[in-house]
């Protein structure tokens, strides 16, 4: 495993991304509940239609380090293979029936609650795909990124974002191909989710966030609180225990 942070361009050395995190407004409890409910519905969708998926980016970090949603995070990030996107769109009524919004996007698919914003409508191209960075819904938002097999890193075959913009924004977010196709189960808040096998997950998170991802935040500060935010129902159960 490469621990040479001097040559890394991981997110914890990217000033623009660190400033973005620092400016995030933590979700309130109502929003947290909606985030978990949308996540739960998405997992059920993938399981119903036999789609391999992973939680990625900050959601993978939150699962491995905090056990769920990082307190400042306001969405969940999923990843699926590019070959499965048409299956998602073909069966989008699953989400619509549950009052969720679904839109095609440059990165893959955007899901959420509330109404689509005017700015998101203006960002659509001729194929009705939202282009560029965007939180398109007035409620909570969720990304489903598309991945594909793409080259080697440290002689390890990896999966990368299909979106060129995503590759430029998160160049070190590469997932070991072996782990991608052989997921295990982990806990995210109160939900059971697909996760990479531990050695693949550690490698992925170190590439993405550097060797101190388990103990430090993006500003280089040692973390004192490793808790996650929970759905209110789960918080009540925890208090009773």
Predicted segment positions?
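Short cationic amphipathic helices and targeting signals
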Residues: 75-80, 193
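Conserved catalytic core of two-metal-ion nucleotidyltransferases
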Residues: 24-49, 95-203, 208, 216-240
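Short, surface-exposed basic-aromatic patches at helix termini and helix-loop junctions that form
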Residues: 70-71, 93-96
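Short, well-structured secondary-structure segments
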Residues: 8, 13, 31-34, 51-62, ...
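Active-site nucleotide-donor binding segment shared across nucleotidyl transfer reactions
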Residues: 43-76, 85
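N-terminal regions immediately upstream of nucleotidyltransferase
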Residues: 1-38
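Short amphipathic alpha-helices within nucleic acid-binding modules
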Residues: 81, 86-91
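Generic hydrophobic alpha-helical membrane-span motif
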Residues: 64, 81-83, 196
